[in-house]
Amino acid sequence: MLAQYNPDIVGGSTGTNNLLFSQDYQASQGLNYAVSGAWANTAPHQADQLVSAIKQEADWESKWKLITVQFGGNDICVASCEINPFSEYYGDATPSGWRSNMDSVLSKLSTMPRTLVVFTESYMPGKLHDMVNPSWKCRLALFVGCSCITRENLAEKTQLRDDYTAELHSLAAHYRSSDFGVEVVPALTGLYPNAPAGGPDASYLAPDCGHFNVKLHSMVIILAFQYSRWIRL
């Protein structure tokens, strides 16, 4: 979408990952260093990779940079109920753990002048429990990929998502400067589109029901772009 307005933009992805959890860089990713299936505790490392790659670009200091960041779904779905203190993400899904990781991300990104960072609020995967007549793939995906959320604790997990958002707004206010902008946009609020029979519409979801398909990705991108037009510096 942005390239339609400025064909000189560089760094955008032109392909897809081969594997859901692949962390191997592929040239088609461009400057997209996001890792599918990642938790917030991996965000600082992704930020390091991105900053290093951007600083290899010609005239990187004088060019404006737009960076979008989306985390939280996996933290709410899996990490938020982890009780094993030896787990790699134990404690990171708390509001304070979330803030610490996102603070680290912004600290690294803020080393680059002329940068706009757009955080999308975390979406609420628990709404998938309301899907009418879900396929067996959807039921399995929820059981395996989102085991922390049940109908009984949905209000608690929704509050956790809201706490994440509050921490992002606090960090955004702290890091904004004359040449470094940070904004939090509700591009994922209200997901998912409803089906005629009620509940989330599976036609907007990937086969595993835990990820977006092209239609829903397009919807989110449009919403993020609309909100981003009002970014403040």
Model-derived regions: residue spans:
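Short coil-to-beta-strand
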Residues: E61-D75, F119, P134-V144, F180-V184
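Conserved SGNH/GDSL esterase-like catalytic core that processes O-acyl groups on lipids
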Residues: M1-S100
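Solvent-exposed, polar/charged alpha-helical surfaces in well-ordered, non-transmembrane soluble domains
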Residues: Q4, H45-D48, S52, S96, ...
